[in-house]
Amino acid sequence: IYMDNKSTVEDVYNTIRSKKVHQIPITAFGKKIIGIVNKKVILNLLMNDIENAQEILKRKIEDIYLPEILTAEPESDVRKVVQIMLDLKLDAIPIVDENDVLMGIVSKTDILKAVSHLPKLQLWS
């Protein structure tokens, strides 16, 4: 799931809610990732200018501040990706190719599901 930078703030918020995701990558020029937005970013934007909330919802998502994002490549060491997610308290990291074109997103849930399928660990004391 991703949204184009020409989407409205309202469309992005509604997609986050309807798809039950925590955040959504924003792309431009095809699928080149330019940012990532979550509900908190949108709600803070609305709360900081409550009198103009309806106007803000109609704005294009590219017109609001998109925080810098960390990305990973498909070949990235999953342990390093997990460590970065833990250190920076990230819920997910977008996966991009060498041209920053969005290929997917890896979330904490994805990692936990993958780990749950590993063989059981044997602990010795």
Language model regions located:
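A glycine-centered beta-loop-beta connector
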Residues: I16-K19, I24-V41, M85, I93-D110
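Tandem CBS (Bateman) regulatory domains
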Residues: N38-E73, D77-D87, L102, S107-S125
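The conserved cystathionine-beta-synthase
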Residues: Y2-V21, T27-A28, T71-K89, V96, ...
